[in-house]
Amino acid sequence: MNNLKLARFFATISKESKYVPNSGSYPLGYKVGAIHCGVKKNSTLDLAVLVSETPASAAAVFTTNKFKAAPVQVSRQILNDKNGKGISSIVVNSGNANAVTGKGGIEDALKMVDTVDSTLKNAPSSTLVMSTGVIGQRLPIDNILKGIPVALKDVGSSHEDWLRCAQGIMTTDTFPKLVSKSFEIDGRKYSLAGLAKGAGMICPNMATLLGFFVTDAPVTPGALSKILTYATDRSFNCISVDGDMSTNDTICAMANGAAGGEEISETSSQFSKIQDEITLFAQQLAQLVVRDGEGATKFITINVQDAQSYADAKKVASSIANSALFKTAMYGKDANWGRILCAVGYADADVNVLKTNVSFIPADGSAELKLLVNGEPEKVDEERASEILELEDLEIRISLGTGGGQEANFWTCDLSHEYVTINGDYRS
Amino acid sequence: MNNLKLARFFATISKESKYVPNSGSYPLGYKVGAIHCGVKKNSTLDLAVLVSETPASAAAVFTTNKFKAAPVQVSRQILNDKNGKGISSIVVNSGNANAVTGKGGIEDALKMVDTVDSTLKNAPSSTLVMSTGVIGQRLPIDNILKGIPVALKDVGSSHEDWLRCAQGIMTTDTFPKLVSKSFEIDGRKYSLAGLAKGAGMICPNMATLLGFFVTDAPVTPGALSKILTYATDRSFNCISVDGDMSTNDTICAMANGAAGGEEISETSSQFSKIQDEITLFAQQLAQLVVRDGEGATKFITINVQDAQSYADAKKVASSIANSALFKTAMYGKDANWGRILCAVGYADADVNVLKTNVSFIPADGSAELKLLVNGEPEKVDEERASEILELEDLEIRISLGTGGGQEANFWTCDLSHEYVTINGDYRS
């Protein structure tokens, strides 16, 4: 147990240095920050705020879990009521999910919104609210309401402010997940920032998946909503740590237009360009969540090709990514094509069993290792397989041989002893 | 590692003594046995046969995995061709699944059928064939074909013969799964014997789920097929060790009528009586498979009540039973209603979130422990919860509060360090 804790500590340090940026290129017109207000018992950051200098377009994708947390219900209502227009800020507390908390929980979430709006002199209902942490307990709402004006005074737009904001939404995450980039459309520079949290679910800290994208591009609410759905489908909905979906999962986007330029609608010529940029960006952010999967020692890309449809390709990829047997084999560094094939076979998708191919694509750029060709097993060079499986990153490519030509990517991690330790033994 | 192996060894001994019967009440007109013929490298039993003295009705439910093993394809064809009539025997090899073996594999399976039929002077295609074990390798078919006449000479109808037959189909199972019982219909005594194997999938020994029921009641093929589907839906399709479905899964039934009496068809008055008997029996056998789940330390019954439909109740139960987070919480003896609720919430079924109840039903008959009442968390007595979770057996009762009144049961085990060790570390 002590060895495991030590190993996890060192893994954390190494992940921090690998995946947390030292600088960034952030969108104009946003200020962010985070403080400790007293939700978490230790003194770590637990209240994060993000403020746009001007009211922005906003969109969100919420959990489909039937037990929707209070902040999910409240934020969804606000976005509906305002048709995704005039959203100025986001407030997030970590340490308590405000889920399964009844009417009182809804009132608490509304109070958080009202306090942000009145402090900033926003129009009413201009703020989205999110929570992550323990479920079934009421928020320490007084601490939060007292903290909000303090947090809002302490916002800024430096790299350190963004990093602090990303830290403020963490629960069991071992490192803050923050990405940023700039890109050009028609000669104009736009920037994107993304923050996320999530590392499987640990109760009492049920670690929700939260993700935020904010840009200074001018995008209509309708276009932003379409882009977010498309990007989420191909990023946060294509990752699996343990297959469970929490009561609080929320991915949201804001576009304030601070960088100027013509407003981008669904029919604009720039629409597909910005959709592609945001999708790639969302994938980058989602992959960080997988890298921080509880007890993860491997980062696995599952690439499914030649399916009849994108949906079929995704079903097969998801079936593999969620197979406990496959995930333990990866942890054991075992070139077990049987388990991969098995998971392909029970997915609800068209497969040509006589034309199915399975290969390992090594992360170091060396030649692929074929495991199954046209439904027949290859004689596998076990030494070569071991070499490939020693690397942290691995891509598994499956061709379903249907002639449909459709493709999907999915990202997952392995299932380790440490996962069981974190999720089963945390009381000891 | 050595401690784990030792623990598993002692767990095996204790399971053997608890779940393997010392005697039985077997159906008339069957002879069974098993030998070592040389499929497995060690000298354990690897070829089992079951022979009915007269041609019998037969039915089977096969894996829905798209990569169907050769014996699955061959047995299905035989049952189709003969409309489930005139089946005299079953032959099973363990140690090699004859899966993903192409045309040669089909030929091997057909040879096994032909050799049994010619040795017994059966009509052609009177034998069903099954295989379990490594996938992707051709059978050592000569050893098997030489072994078949030897095995068929050495059959009997004693308890020891039935036990030997159950041992002959084992791969990674830690104990043979054999049950038998007698029951009366209209004053006539009938008997049932059941054998099963399965303990999660371990590659290279991908441990298929196989199950057999044989009875001396006279049942038409149509009625038997209906009964088997009904019973399997409520037994083998209601268990989960790790959620994966193999290329070889097969549940089959035979009814030879050796006990006499009027033939039972779908319209007979005795139909529902024998269907209920076989269903209860199938549940008993399926539960043994869960008890032998890889690394299992807990046996968990999930009882979902007040669903809109049986299908909905089963979906919710299955969602909980397959949640890695729930299963690790059970291993950690943690009364984590949040994870249960979460799995309820993402199942594709009607749920009244304001009327959902969750309770622990202790195995020792003491009072239930309410965790969630009408969607609101109870103050849980942690000491009482710990007491309940110390027991090997536990029932979790969930009421969905829909007013539909439908109910389903599901059986599962926990997810332990040992599961990861068995499935990830077996090469070390």
Curated annotation (Swiss-Prot), chains A, B:
The keyword Mitochondrion applies. The active site is at residue 208. Pathway: Amino-acid biosynthesis; L-arginine biosynthesis; L-ornithine and N-acetyl-L-glutamate from L-glutamate and N(2)-acetyl-L-ornithine (cyclic): step 1/1; Amino-acid biosynthesis; L-arginine biosynthesis; N(2)-acetyl-L-ornithine from L-glutamate: step 1/4. Keywords: Acyltransferase, Amino-acid biosynthesis, Arginine biosynthesis, Autocatalytic cleavage, Mitochondrion, Multifunctional enzyme, Transferase. HAMAP family: ArgJ. Belongs to the ArgJ family. This is Arginine biosynthesis bifunctional protein ArgJ, mitochondrial. It comes from Komagataella phaffii (strain GS115 / ATCC 20864).
